[in-house]
């Protein structure tokens, strides 16, 4: 995972009211550090070059329809490949019913499997927007903003050195 800010998977599950289809012990404490989400359409065909395992994976109607045309053995092979990468979570959109091979593979690899009733594109854009805010770098500064002759001036300094008192004295 990256070195920047992180967010617990449990927070995302609660925020988006995701249904937990399978969650190994401690799954709520998994840390998410990547602001992007992947739709593993190419991976469902067997292409895993340049696959970013640190992203959450979102399966929608397109991926599900493709898998429906595959045999149970092919589905098992694809899900085994996907879950073997140990991504933070796999989310099924549109309230789609998981294939038995999907559940079996999630348990086999102790992978988190979630579901939302939301439309795939809407959920993806909302989740990415949320992750962008939650995982944005932040910085804390001690300071007070004062107006001097109509211009804003930021007085910065260590905590407790009298910035606010200086501001109050300038008002008097």
Describe the residue ranges of each PLM region.
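Charged, amphipathic alpha-helical linker segments immediately N-terminal to NTP-binding catalytic cores
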Residues: 86-89, 95-131
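Short secondary-structure boundary/capping elements
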Residues: 70-74, 98, 138
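Conserved small/polar residues in nucleotide/adenosyl-binding loops
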Residues: 171-172
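P-loop NTPase nucleotide-binding/switch module
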Residues: 130-150
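Hydrophobic anchor at the beta1->P-loop junction of P-loop NTPases
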Residues: 155
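Conserved glycine(s) of the Walker
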Residues: 162-163
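Gly/Thr-rich phosphate-binding loop signature of adenosyl cofactor/nucleotide-binding cores
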Residues: 2-83
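Hydrophobic positions on the alpha1 helix immediately C-terminal to the Walker A/P-loop
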Residues: 166
């Amino acid at each position: 995972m990256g070195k920047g800010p992180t967010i617990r998977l449990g927070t995302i599950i609660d925020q988006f009211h995701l249904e937990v289809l399978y969650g190994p012990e401690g799954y709520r404490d998994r840390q998410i550090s990547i602001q992007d989400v992947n739709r593993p359409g190419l991976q469902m065909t067997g292409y895993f070059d340049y696959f970013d395992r640190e992203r959450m994976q979102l399966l929608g109607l397109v991926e599900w329809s493709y898998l429906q045309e595959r045999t149970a053995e092919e589905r098992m092979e694809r899900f085994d490949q996907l879950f073997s990468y140990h991504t933070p979570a796999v989310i099924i959109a549109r309230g789609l019913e998981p294939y038995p091979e999907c559940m079996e593979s999630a348990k086999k690899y102790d992978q988190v499997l979630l579901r939302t009733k939301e439309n795939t594109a809407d959920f993806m854009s909302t989740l990415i927007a949320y992750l962008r805010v939650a995982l944005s770098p932040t910085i804390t500064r001690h300071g007070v903003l004062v107006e001097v002759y109509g211009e804003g001036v930021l007085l910065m300094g260590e905590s407790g050195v009298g910035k606010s008192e200086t501001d109050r004295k300038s008002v008097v």
